[in-house]
Amino acid sequence: MLKKGKLYIIGDSYSTFEGCIPEGFAAWYFSGGTDVTDVTEKTETWWHMLISKTGMPLLLNNSWSGTTICNTTYDGAYCPDTSFIGRFDKAAAELAKNPPEVLIIFGGTNDSWSGAPVDSLQWENWTDEDLKKVLPAFCYLLCRIKQVLPKTQTAVIINTELKPEIESGMTAACEKQGIEYIKLENISKQNGHPDKEGM
């Protein structure tokens, strides 16, 4: 059960919608739709349905299509400005001043699709090289969230069809940190992304 209060989202394409994410961030879902999805309105997205049902005010939807949790993206490119960990660190000071009651993390899909190095769980002494790898970066993200937002309820959504080692690693990391997680099952998708039914 989620707390009542302000919601903050860190996500990838699955959580985007044109005009609902920071300026300059890439979206997957657009008003009026595209030929790759049947989602045409923001009211059809999972996050908008959540805030409509709960009445939670959305502090920010910090979601960027195509982004990874770690600092490695497609073609092995280094991406500290777009990664989940980079975006959280950039937002950390402001979040500490105006903390959300609930933070939802929905990522790992592009880490899986891009072929970013996975490695294993690591809970301290991260180097720049460590943060180029999926599971060390995910552990770093969870630790930073607890450090910056100790009173915020954090929940992680784990997608279907991830690499098994990413899915199991994210699950184990959440369990170790006592962070709630939701594992999706058999959701309907078009072109690898949730459609109306899958939302």
Predicted features along the sequence, with ranges:
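Conserved SGNH/GDSL esterase-like catalytic core that processes O-acyl groups on lipids
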Residues: 20-119
